[in-house]
Amino acid sequence: MSGPRSGSGSGGSTGRPGDADSQRSAYEKEVHELTTQVTFLEEEVAMLRRRLSESPRQVRVLEERLAQVQVELQTATGQNDKLVATLREARDQIISLKEEVDRLAQPPSGYGVFIRGYDDGTVDVFTQGRKLRVTVSPNVEADVLQPGQEVMLNEALNVVEVRAFERQGEIVLLKEVLESGDRALVIGHTDEERVVMLAQPLLDGPIRAGDSLLIEPRSGYAFERIPKSEVEELVLEEVPDIGYEQIGGLKGQIESIRDAVELPFLYKELFLEHKLKPPKGVLLYGPPGCGKTLIAKAVANSLAKKVEAQTGQGSGRAFFLNIKGPELLNKYVGETERQIRLVFQRAREKASEGMPVIVFFDEMDSIFRTRGSGVSSDVENTIVPQLLSEIDGVEQLENVIVIGASNREDMIDPAILRPGRLDVKIKVERPDAEAAKDIFAKYVLPELPLHADDLAEHGGNREATCQGMIQRVVERMYAESEENRFLEVTYANGDKEVLYFKDFNSGAMIENIVARAKKMAVKDLIESGVRGLRMQHLLSACLDEFKENEDLPNTTNPDDWARISGKKGERIVYIRTLVTGTKGTEAGRSIDTIANTGQYL
């Protein structure tokens, strides 16, 4: 067994020597290739390791570059937006400037007054002193054009726009409307008469002779009726808000004027049945400050309420034309008479509508004096006849009554006072003690702040406190005591009479006394913090009021002053004041040496 094994072994090693070399060469070659590959791979690995170590730094560089590029992009975007906005603004400015240039380059537009239109679309207009027939722009509806309306004309004198009616011009007086209805005869400021066309607003509304019209003299159109302030100011469109309950101490006078004014209007059938004519006028006379004007206003208020209750309408109305005497006087001859005519013309117009109208003349003696009694002029010679004719004209009207007020009825022309004109004469006298209490009660009210001490005296009853205050202050005012002596008058026959403050009291004086007392209460509250009106305030106010009226009008005719103040009878030739000072040491004085004027006397 060992023989063949060694034989085969030696035979094999000696039999193939070339194969071993080739194998070795192949092996070495393979080793060399592998070594080369390993070396390449090692270099590749080294290079990869080197690249791997360098990658984070490159990433950071790239990120920084990217951030820088983004910032530059944002900056460029903002600059681009600004540039776009600038370009747009420049374009808008260019467009605006172009429009402005085009607007300024347009030819001027003229104005004209529309006269009439035609079926073919043309119209007549008056412009620049010429009457032209022109066409109307398609943008303008020719049907809406009204006579007298202002229109705008382009360069070719075509109507391109409709405007409102003219609002400025001259004021003329309407004399009459002509038969055609669209023309009127007017009187200018120089008494020049001319015929004008009536614009559409005047064609739609009623106009009367005597109205003031606004005209444009070049076109000859009247556009608007202008209210006449001289008459409109005298008309109180709203009913006066004064009622009979607000007037104190004049119950008898109120009843008399209600019988004269309200009964004929509210019970017309009964008056007709008894063939009784209603009075045309009422004269309220008496001293100043006693309520004559208040009564006249209360009549209008009461009459309006009675009309509302009788007719069932929602809002009763009574027109109250309040004419103060001196307002009518004018330096031009005939102006006063004209204004009187206008006042009664307005009264007739309102009365024709079924509304009661009261024409109230305050201070009637200032213009309707006895004819022939003027010193520097005799204007009353024409004013009085004008009023007489107007009052007689009221005879045919059912709803107009004249009320006059005066504190010198003896100076009014007797023709005005006779029956058939101012039929009813009501004397508004100075208040006596009972009337004074009634007047005080209108102003000293329980809801006023009253002093705690005064309330305590009357058990906290506010009504009783007010009554107690009124009772004491009236007793103080009407006491015929030494401190209340006011005047000593000497009559023509030599008799003398002492007059007290109560003889010159009035409703206005009582109102002023209460106002003084309230002001004292306010000052006490401000200075000392004590709230409430008290008795002492009223008594002090009464003394202050008496003291103020110490000075009388400086007149050389005491009898005239006595008539104004309400003391009438035998002629007075001398008046001496008896008012003493606070200490009772001041002597009486003659009025002839006194220059100041009292408040109510």
From Swiss-Prot:
Sites where the protein binds ATP: 289-294
Coiled-coil residue windows: 19-106
Pathway(s) the chain acts in: Protein degradation; proteasomal Pup-dependent pathway
Record keywords: ATP-binding, Chaperone, Coiled coil, Nucleotide-binding, Proteasome
Spans annotated as Disordered: 1-29
MF annotations from Gene Ontology: ATP binding; ATP hydrolysis activity
Oxidoreductase recorded as keyword: no
Biased composition (Gly residues): 1-15
Superkingdom, natural source: Bacteria
Biased composition (Basic and acidic residues): 18-29
Swiss-Prot/TrEMBL GO biological process terms: modification-dependent protein catabolic process; proteasomal protein catabolic process
UniProt keyword rRNA-binding, yes or no: no
PANTHER family documented for this protein: AAA-FAMILY ATPASE (PTHR23077), PROTEASOME-ASSOCIATED ATPASE (PTHR23077:SF144)
Free-text note regarding domains: Consists of three main regions, an N-terminal coiled-coil domain that binds to protein Pup and functions as a docking station, an interdomain involved in ARC hexamerization, and a C-terminal ATPase domain of the AAA type.
Assembly notes: Homohexamer. Assembles into a hexameric ring structure that caps the 20S proteasome core. Strongly interacts with the prokaryotic ubiquitin-like protein Pup through a hydrophobic interface; the interacting region of ARC lies in its N-terminal coiled-coil domain. There is one Pup binding site per ARC hexamer ring. Upon ATP-binding, the C-terminus of ARC interacts with the alpha-rings of the proteasome core, possibly by binding to the intersubunit pockets.
Protein name (Swiss-Prot/TrEMBL): Proteasome-associated ATPase
Organism annotation: Parafrankia sp. (strain EAN1pec)
Gene that encodes the chain: arc
